Regions:
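Boundary at the C-terminal end of the N-terminal hydrophobic targeting segment
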Residues: 8-14
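Sequence context surrounding c-type heme c attachment/ligation sites in exported
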Residues: 16-49, 65-154
Length: 154
């Protein structure tokens, strides 16, 4: 297991912080990763999102590499979208809602075509039922883009 990938995969001591099904943890340094792209989610979620990637992910995006290599880790940070108090037409991040992580490791996750997922609220993984929706959404919608929705923002 490569070092960047090891950061996102649970160890035995961190099992309670690992996502059900996949065993993915929040990577320690994800807030320092490079921005891949911002996004908005309309109602009912009404969120502002930022997708960041580790060095493996960023290199793949910059070179246009598909399939993403093993060791790719993406994190999607989400906040409630609220009007700016200084400029009403603008939206700004409000309360943080979740961080979602996707890890590419073909050997560890053969049942989900090499993808492991984690969804975290307040630093803790959500329940198994919510994790069952991850690959079920990615597989039919973005199979032809290596199961990744996010495109690199210029």
């Amino acid at each position: 297991v490569s070092f960047p990938l090891a950061l996102a995969v649970a160890s035995a001591d961190e099992g309670d912080l690992a996502s059900p099904i996949y065993g993915v943890n929040l990577p320690d340094d994800y807030r320092r990763w490079e921005l891949i792209a911002p996004a908005e989610e309309s109602a009912p979620l009404d969120e502002i999102r930022a997708v960041v990637g580790n060095a493996v992910a960023v290199a793949a995006y910059r070179t246009g590499t598909l399939a993403f290599p093993d060791g790719t880790v993406l994190a999607k940070l989400a906040w409630k979208r609220v009007p700016s108090p200084e400029f009403a037409p603008a939206s700004v991040p409000g309360t943080a809602t979740a961080v979602q992580v996707m890890v590419k490791d073909a050997q560890r996750y053969p049942e989900s075509d090499g993808r492991g997922f984690g969804r975290f609220v307040d630093g803790k993984p959500v329940d198994r039922a919510q994790h069952e929706t991850c690959f079920a959404c990615h597989e039919p919608n973005v199979r032809d883009h290596d199961y990744v929705f996010t495109r690199f923002a210029p």
